[in-house]
Amino acid sequence: DGQGGFWPGIEKREVPDGASMDDYTLPQELLLPVAGPVTSGYGFRDNPVNGADDFHAGVDIAAAEGTPVAAAQSGQVVRTGYNRLRGYYIIIRHEGSVQTLYQHLSYIFVRGGETVTQGQTVAAVGSTGLVTGPHLHLEIILDGVRVDPMPSFPQLAA
């Protein structure tokens, strides 16, 4: 069929609505919120909690419980909250239709509506929600669509 890239007999998986595997360019540079190894990348994976084949809409960065989490860029806190999957989380809106989402936090130091600066400590790494251990789950949302954070943080690929 000329499409290539797929093994015969392997079914093509569709990226879920609200996510993209396409290349993108952000209007500003982002700061890595926490240093550590990537334990789960963006895209299709075997879920480490339940073994299901699913789409992971962010990257997981391992770090010790309580490690400070910095705002990737200046912006306004859209929402903070808790749910059983994300645990404690923060969404920050930045210029250029960019949002960053930080999940599985142990503590949140900011409130909805607050303005934050790049590098400001906004939370602490935790293991809340559906997790196997302490880490930061980080997502980048561009124009309402989740994109792979790895190209924005080349130090994660090292």
Region spans (language model):
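Surface-exposed, glycine-biased beta-strand/turn segments
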Residues: G2-R86
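Residue-level recognition of beta-strand microenvironments
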Residues: G41, T80-G81, I108, V125-T128
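Generic beta-structure capping elements
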Residues: G41-G43, A64, R93-E95, L105, ...
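Zn2+-dependent peptidoglycan hydrolase active-site motif and core
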Residues: D54-A57, A71-F109, P134-H135, E139
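Glycine-centered loop/turn positions within well-structured domains
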Residues: V59, T67, T100, I108, ...
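Active-site acidic-Proline motif in GNAT/NAT acetyltransferases
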Residues: A63, Y107-I108, G112
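Short, well-structured beta-strand-loop connectors
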Residues: P68-V78, V110-V125
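Conserved, short, structured surface segments that act as functional micro-motifs
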Residues: Y88-H94, L101, E114-A158
